[in-house]
């Protein structure tokens, strides 16, 4: 709506974004439209904010400063937290408040600031031995106007490929230009070499998204197995 001329009310002072890695480009674009967007990081088990940027303490590359009631440590790239957390999961043993909780998120911490890299389970290890968080190139793809869904693959493969759903108004040549722009921001090993454009979006009904619209990567990989095999056999860009 903001791109179409809608102006936010002057009373709107702060918009917190999170739930997935948000690219710097997307935040800058939102702010250029007078949307006061600040990235944070949290999880339900922490009820729920762990770190947050603010107008007086803002690092656009990061998920902000850790809040005072949370303790953090990093082990093998994974963030562990301790503090005022949840009591536990239903029908499971209570959570020990003195025990560190493994978040499953890959994070860098510099002083008191968190830099989110992605989910541990979404780490791609290529056949060249490169470790790449899928959310890294995905967040850049999704920062481009008209790219509505993007899921990156490449586990055990020599390069990365992507499944993309884009606005029907976006032509293939323009989409290719967008991907080229994104690739210039990535090192060679993390660039999208091949991509497949979907005719219809991934959906919960197809079993390809969770109920909160996160990609079910294994299901997507199986659904488009033939596409990926053709990518790595022939190196062609395919459109449905």
Where are these regions (language model features)?
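Conserved ATP/PPi-binding loop(s) of AMP-dependent carboxylate-activating enzymes
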Residues: 36, 65-68, 75-100, 113-114, ...
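Ser/Thr-glycine-rich phosphate-binding loops at phosphate-binding pockets of nucleotides
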Residues: 43-46, 102-103, 126-127, 210-212
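AMP-binding/adenylate-forming catalytic core of the ANL superfamily
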Residues: 83, 106-190, 194, 201
């Amino acid at each position: 709506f903001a791109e179409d001329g809608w102006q936010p009310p002057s009373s709107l002072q702060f918009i917190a974004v999170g739930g997935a890695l948000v690219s710097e480009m997307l935040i800058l674009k939102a702010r250029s439209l007078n949307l006061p967007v600040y990235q944070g990081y949290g999880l339900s088990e922490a009820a729920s904010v762990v770190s947050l940027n603010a107008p007086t303490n803002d690092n656009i590359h990061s998920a902000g400063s850790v809040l005072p009631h949370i303790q953090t440590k990093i082990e093998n790239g994974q963030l562990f937290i301790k503090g005022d957390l949840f009591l536990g999961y239903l029908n499971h043993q209570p959570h020990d408040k003195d025990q560190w909780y493994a978040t499953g998120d890959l994070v860098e911490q510099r002083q008191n600031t968190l830099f989110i890299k992605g989910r541990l389970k979404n780490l791609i290890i290529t056949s060249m031995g490169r470790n790449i968080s899928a959310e890294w190139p995905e967040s850049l793809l999704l920062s481009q106007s008209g790219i509505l869904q993007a899921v990156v693959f490449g586990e055990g493969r020599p390069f990365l490929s992507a499944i993309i759903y884009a606005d029907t108004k976006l032509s293939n040549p323009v989409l290719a230009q967008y991907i080229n722009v994104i690739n210039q921001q990535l090192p060679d090993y993390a660039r999208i070499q091949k991509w497949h454009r979907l005719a219809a979006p991934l959906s919960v009904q197809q079993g390809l998204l969770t109920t909160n619209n996160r990609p079910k990567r294994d299901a997507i990989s199986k659904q488009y197995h033939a596409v990926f095999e053709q990518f790595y056999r022939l190196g062609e860009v395919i459109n449905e």
